[in-house]
């Protein structure tokens, strides 16, 4: 990251509570920046027996934001996830396809619903995806990463 390029930008970090997005917050903090952090909630309001609990993820995201002096806001995108990702995935599986729900979640929820609700107020939105960008002819492009094992540009392919 080039500090001169981002120091005056309003930055949002999508903080999942995992290692990768936590490192993003650490990297910004090491540059003296304190982005606003957002935890995207995609689980239902009530605990369901089939639901993956996000409680620990939210606790970790809260701890990371607090450690680096960043604000953390929970953004409820359960409805959007269910109607746009889960339903789409089920329809495609029924039709004999093997969709990738993570790709759809990134496009429709992380960079779709989040952007409509809050992200449009920010100059930059950072995630913990392992990817690179490259400047070509004055435009920034998503490019593959040097480590093919960690490579995650496929998850960002449709944004």
Say what each PLM segment does.
Residues 1-158:
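ATP-dependent adenylation/nucleotidyltransferase module used to activate substrates
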């Amino acid at each position: 990251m080039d500090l001169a390029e981002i120091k005056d930008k309003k930055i949002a970090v999508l903080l999942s509570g995992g290692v990768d997005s936590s490192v993003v917050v650490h990297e910004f903090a090491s540059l003296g920046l304190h982005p606003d952090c957002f935890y995207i909630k995609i689980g239902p309001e009530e605990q369901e027996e089939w639901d993956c609990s996000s409680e620990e993820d939210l606790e970790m995201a809260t701890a990371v934001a607090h450690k680096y002096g960043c604000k953390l806001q929970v953004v409820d995108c359960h409805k959007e996830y269910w109607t746009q990702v889960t339903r789409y995935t089920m329809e495609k599986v029924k039709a004999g396809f093997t969709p990738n729900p993570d790709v759809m979640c990134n496009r429709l929820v992380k960079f779709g619903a989040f952007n409509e609700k809050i992200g449009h107020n920010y100059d930059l939105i950072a995630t913990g995806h392992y990817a690179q960008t490259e400047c070509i002819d004055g435009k920034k492009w998503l490019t593959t990463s040097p480590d093919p094992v960690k490579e995650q540009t496929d998850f960002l392919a449709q944004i």
